[in-house]
Amino acid sequence: MAVVDIKNMNGETVSQAELPDSIFDVEVKSSVLHEVVKMQLARRRSGTASTKGRSDVAGSRAKLFRQKGTGRARRGDVKSPLLKGGGVVFGPHPRSFDYSVPKKVRKLALKMALTSKLRDNTLTVVDQFRFDRIKTKDFVGAINALGAANALVISDGSETLEKSARNVPKVKVLKCEGLNVYDILKYKNLVLPEAAIKMIEGRLL
């Protein structure tokens, strides 16, 4: 098992914790991470892009002028895709981009993302991350003391923590249940409270 230092909010080491190898020491495969991140981003798409086809555009269906004898190029009705204001050919219509990858693959990708943070020395474990009041300055001071700017911070549900951090750039606070591959990889650092380790074990083992 890997051993990591547990720090307080002043950046001082107060104890150590063991991390299970089955979660924090697995083979990292970029193809698996890519597939899960691609799925997450696809699920976030609104899929509301919409265009009007020839049958949707308002206008007469009458032929503009006779087929032959005018010397001009032949024309159909005003809704022709060739004309300004006409319909769009093969344009987008509202649809869902949602798809899923197997649950085992999603769990494996999460383990890989956590492993990569540990190996890159960008995983910080804190004894607790709580504040007595909602104060952005206090949160920024704690993050700087931990050397974890540009970080994904895992919360144990503390409202003061979430509200103190919501206006800080390049920082995101997530509850442990919302831990996901995309956000772990997006931010340089990952800050975990000690209690979250057991919750992650329960979710992934």
From Swiss-Prot:
Record's GO cellular component terms: ribonucleoprotein complex; ribosome
Keyword Ribosomal protein: yes
One annotated GO molecular function: rRNA binding
Coiled-coil zones: none
Annotated stretches, region: Disordered: 43-77
Gene3D superfamilies: 3.40.1370.10
A Pfam family: Ribosomal_L4
Biased composition (Basic residues): 63-73
A Gene Ontology biological process term: translation
Highest taxon above the source species: Bacteria
Keywords: Ribonucleoprotein, Ribosomal protein, RNA-binding, rRNA-binding
Keyword Ribonucleoprotein: yes
Biological role stated in the UniProt entry: One of the primary rRNA binding proteins, this protein initially binds near the 5'-end of the 23S rRNA. It is important during the early stages of 50S assembly. It makes multiple contacts with different domains of the 23S rRNA in the assembled 50S subunit and ribosome. Forms part of the polypeptide exit tunnel.
Quaternary structure and partners: Part of the 50S ribosomal subunit.
Record family assignment: Belongs to the universal ribosomal protein uL4 family.
Name of this protein: Large ribosomal subunit protein uL4
Organism: Desulfosudis oleivorans (strain DSM 6200 / JCM 39069 / Hxd3) (Desulfococcus oleovorans)
Gene of this entry: rplD
